[in-house]
């Protein structure tokens, strides 16, 4: 079941990218509307999920009407943020002239694990760099891990490790306090990725239950909410098998 928040958040990301590529605010806002409409049109028969709190003004929560009203405001706030901070946080460029706007990364880590993604923004801050991820939700991320992964990915692919990271909260129109990403290293991430790969290969998926689960579009496939889809295994029998194997070695 698709969520309006995914379509709306993607539309905000797209519109801010259009703005940073040189468009004016009016064009960027129109880019939001066009992208949002296209996303909804791709699934004309779908029942879309609305997240957010229901209020007297928005009795259905953050539905399509909410996003059409609030999405453009997020784009305008971003444009004002860039106007206010461009002297402090100019867009960084790679040596090849590639701008830090949806900067592609696809480095390979130890063990053949390839990480592919796009970094929303990379800003220059005097002699340092700042990686920034745009968030259109109402809650700030609890961890800087995503930013740390981006920093290491940039080091492997572009030869520079950004010292700082921050989330830009589109609803507020401001960045979260910058955090030092120096302690994120390739060795640390490679170890985590290897362990995650082992878990996937063993068909082990541990639910991460948070307040965001209420708006998740795929929770019907998660056994934390739908017991009938739980993996077919017996924890006790697996332990017994492991114990017997060790006894016979």
Can you say where each PLM-predicted feature lies in the sequence?
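Short, polar/flexible loop-turn hinges at active-site or ligand-entry regions and domain interfaces
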Residues: 1-4, 22-24, 203-207
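Gly/serine-rich nucleotide phosphate-binding loop at the start of the catalytic core
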Residues: 2-16
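Hydrophobic (often cysteine-bearing) scaffold residues that line and stabilize catalytic clefts
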Residues: 4, 8, 67, 71, ...
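Short amphipathic alpha-helical face segments that pack within enzyme cores
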Residues: 11-14, 145-153
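A non-catalytic, helix-rich entry segment at domain boundaries
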Residues: 15-104
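Active-site catalytic microenvironments for nucleophilic, acid-base chemistry
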Residues: 18-22, 152-157
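Non-catalytic protein-protein interaction segments used by genome-maintenance enzymes to assemble
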Residues: 95-149, 158
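Metal-dependent nuclease catalytic regions and adjoining charged, substrate-binding loops involved
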Residues: 96-103, 111, 141-144, 154-249
């Amino acid at each position: 079941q698709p969520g309006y928040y995914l379509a709306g958040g993607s539309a905000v990301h797209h519109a801010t990218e259009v703005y940073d590529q040189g468009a004016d605010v009016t064009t960027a806002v129109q880019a939001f509307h066009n992208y949002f409409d296209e996303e909804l049109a791709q699934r004309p028969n779908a029942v879309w999920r609305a997240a957010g709190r229901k209020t007297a003004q928005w009795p259905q929560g953050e539905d399509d009407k909410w996003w059409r009203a609030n999405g453009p405001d997020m784009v305008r706030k971003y444009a004002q943020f860039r106007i206010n901070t461009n002297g402090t946080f100019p867009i960084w460029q790679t040596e090849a002239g590639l701008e830090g706007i949806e900067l592609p990364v696809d480095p390979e880590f130890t063990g053949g694990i390839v990480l592919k993604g796009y970094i929303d923004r990379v800003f220059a801050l005097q002699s340092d760099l700042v990686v920034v991820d745009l968030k259109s939700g109402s809650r700030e991320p609890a961890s800087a891990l995503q930013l740390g992964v981006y920093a290491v990915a940039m080091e492997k692919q572009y030869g520079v490790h950004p010292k700082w990271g921050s989330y830009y909260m589109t609803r507020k129109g401001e960045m979260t306090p910058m955090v030092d990403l120096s302690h994120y290293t390739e060795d640390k991430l490679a170890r985590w990725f290897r362990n995650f790969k082992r878990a996937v290969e063993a068909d082990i998926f541990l639910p991460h239950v948070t307040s965001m689960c209420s708006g998740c579009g795929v929770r019907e496939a998660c056994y934390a909410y739908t017991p009938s889809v739980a993996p077919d295994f017996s924890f006790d029998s697996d332990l017994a098998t492991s114990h017997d194997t060790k006894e016979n070695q």
